[in-house]
Amino acid sequence: MHLLFVTSIVPDGALASGYEIANAAIIAALRRGGARVTVIGFTWPGKAAADPENTVVLGAIDVRTESASAPLKLAWVGKAMLSGLTFASVKLRAVSARDVKTAIQQAGPFDGYVLNSVQFAGAFEKLFEDRPSIFVAHNVEHLSARENAAAAGSLFQRLLFRREARLLEVVEQRLCRRARFVFTLAGEDRAALGVASDDRSAVLPLVTGAKAPAHKGPRRIDCDAALIGTWTWQPNRIGLDWFLGKVVPHLRPDFRVRIAGHMPSGITSTHPGVEFVDRVPDARAFVCGAAVIPLISTAGSGVQLKTIETFELGLPSVATSRSLRGIDHRPGNCVVTDDPANFARALEAAAANVRDVDGSAFHRRQVEALDVAIRLGLEKLGTVRHEVLA
């Protein structure tokens, strides 16, 4: 079976974000399931596709709102209003539908589409109606947009996110309805998308790499707690605001917290132990230098890749319940609480008595369950393909 994996940004091997880590895991699982996979989408500027022989590149594009100029942001808003598309999808209209159709045809004969998230599929929706499809819902995007609207700092942002939520809900409903099968990254997302039946959907348990992270002896602890993420992404920003505003005030003054990742303006902390370190050369080494990892998601849907990485590494953690979306097995060194004061106390206790565990068993269970779910989706798609050919 030859599948066309339709995604906004094609893998470049860097695995710089949770989205890219998830894509790599899903593509690898599809191939383990026996499918030939060709990927189509854009590259980041200055980046090349990791697997050029099996990738169709539509061009280079930077879709990050935080790094866009004010004129470009206004242009995106204007195009979204005129076209009726979401703000997220209109960014991908850097090429015409005709160009995308030509690229699809040049990909060669194939049996179906894997529509990876709503952004690209929503930008060129009608082009993907001629063959059976699987829809991969990384998040319930319309619910995330509603949460973003509630947390928006300005009326303009609030109205923009509300519009995004309305449009996304309709597009997600259409993509799910047309898809022969739907993959989500968290169990609760199946019901939220109206595909809770086992005949319509399955959860994809993810991993951050093909192999479990290797242990290299005792860790060197540089700080009490460490966080790293794309804080300009609104659901992550909401969690960071909660952590800094609600949890950190309960921490001892000498408790050391290091926070890495691109930081939006306005993020500060008066706690003497909090340090913002911007980007770091090695994200894994950074988190392994902490006694405990705070998993602080309070918004959004889908799965938290930082949670998966923490569990694969066997690191101690304190997690909100939202941080465990899509996770069936919680290791013994993970404490769960949504109360800020209890969260702070649990961090201090974990840092005072560091207890790592072997994360390889967690990784192995995730891979096995991922492959089972992928095979189920491929079987559903294969059944439709045979019906069409008949």
Feature locations, PLM:
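A charged, aromatic-enriched C-terminal amphipathic alpha-helix characteristic of glycosyltransferases
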Residues: 95, 352-390
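Acceptor-binding helix/loop patch of EC 2.4 sugar-transfer enzymes
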Residues: 71-90, 134-166
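A conserved catalytic-core segment of Leloir-type glycosyltransferases
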Residues: 42-102
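Membrane-proximal helix-turn-helix segments that form the acceptor-binding/catalytic region
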Residues: 101-105, 141, 153-182
